[in-house]
Amino acid sequence: MPEPIIVNHLGNSIQQIGLAATGHSFEIHEWRGSGPDYLHVHHSDDEAWHVLEGTLTFRFVDRQVETSAGTTVFVPAGVPHTYFVAGEPTRYLIILTPRLRALIEALHSTPREQHGAVMKQFDSAILS
C-alpha cells in the first residue's frame, strides 16, 4: 500500500516530491525564481502554485494578480499565463506534469530566441 509523503518546509532547504512518489502523474517542487518573462500557454497540461513566503505575481491575458503566502493558484491547460517574483524573497511550491518539468529543463538550456520552437515540442506556445 502506498504511504503518504510529508515534506517539512521549515528552514531554507529545497525539497521535492518527484515522479516515482506520484505514480509519474505530477511533481511538486519548492522554487524561488520567476517564470518566463513572456505570456505563454500549455495546451495539454495543468499547472499550480502554492505560495509559502513572499509575493508571487501572475499575469494573465486580461489581468495581473499579486498573491501572498497561503495562496494557491491553479491554471488549467489552455489558459495563457506567466508569473514572476518581484522584490522580497519568495518561496513557493509548483505542481506540474512531467512534460512541463521537461519543458522547463529544455528552456533553461536553450537560447531565448529558440524558446518558441522548444515550446511547440511540448504542446505549448509563446503568446507575447
Sequence positions of predicted segments:
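Short acidic-glycine-tyrosine-enriched beta hairpin
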Residues: A48, D62-P80
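A generic structural motif
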Residues: S34-P36, D46, E53-T55, G78-P80, ...
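Ligand-binding loop in jelly-roll beta-barrel domains
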Residues: T22, A69, A77-A102
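Double-stranded beta-helix
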Residues: E88-S128
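Short strand-coil-strand connectors
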Residues: L10, R59-R63, A86
